[in-house]
C-alpha cells in the first residue's frame, strides 16, 4: 500500500482503498485485485526479474508475404521502436494487424528481449496464441483466468488483467483492441499495462477505432501513428453514398426498388 493525498492506494493495481476494505484486525486490504492474492497494509510485494531465454534463430518461421501497405507499417513499427518511441497502429478490421507486428516481435526476441501481447478480450488472446504458436519457434505462454501459470516464456499472450502479475518485465508491450471494454478508461488495467513494461520498453497499440486519448497523445508527439485504411487484399474501402428518396414507401408498395439502389 502507498499513501497518496492522505488516502491509501494499492501498489499492485493502483486502486483507491475504500474505508470499509478492512480486515478484523483493522488492516486495510485491496478488494479490486484480491483474485491475485490478498495485498494488505503493512505487507510488501516482491517480484523476480525476467530471465534471458534461449531461442532458436530465426525465431519467426512465418513464410507469408505482406502487401506493400502492410510492409510499410511493419517497417515503420521497427524504426519507431528503434527511436525509443511508442506506436499506434490505426488500421481497419481485416487489414492484417497481427501479421504487421511479426517483424518487430521477432526483432525484440532475437535481441534477448521479452514481449507481451495483451488484449482485454480472452477470445482474442486464444486466437493470437494459436497463430503465434504456428509462426514462432520460441516458447509462448497464454495467460488468462483459466490458463496455466507463467513458465518464463519470452513471449507472453495475456488478457490485460493478467499483466497485474508483472513488474518491469517486457521490452515491448503490444495492446490489441486497445479501444475495447473493459480496458478503455479503466485505471487499474491501464496501470497494469504501464507497470509491466521495463523502464526502456515501448508500447504498440492496435485498434480499428482510435480513441480521443490516443489521438491526443499523437497530437502531443508522445505517440507515433501509423494508419492503414485498406484490408489485406489491397482494395480501398467501400464508402457509403447518400441520396434522397422521397417516394421510397410508394416504390416498395408497387414492388419496385428505387433506381439508385439497383446500381
What are these regions (language model features)?
Residues 170-259:
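Post-DEXD/H (motif II) to motif III coupling segment of the RecA-like Helicase ATP-binding lobe
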Residues 82-106:
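Walker A/P-loop
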Residues 121-124, 149, 180-181, 211:
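Residues immediately C-terminal
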Residues 62-85:
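N-terminal pre-P-loop "Q-motif" helix
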Residues 113-121, 262-263:
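Conserved RecA-like ASCE P-loop NTPase motor core of nucleic-acid helicases/translocases
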Residues 2-52:
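Interdomain "pre-motor" coupling segment immediately N-terminal to P-loop NTPase/helicase cores
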Residues 107-110, 148-150, 165-168, 195-200, ...:
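Conserved catalytic network of the ASCE P-loop NTPase/AAA+ motor domain
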Residues 131-166:
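Inter-Walker segment of RecA-like/P-loop motor cores
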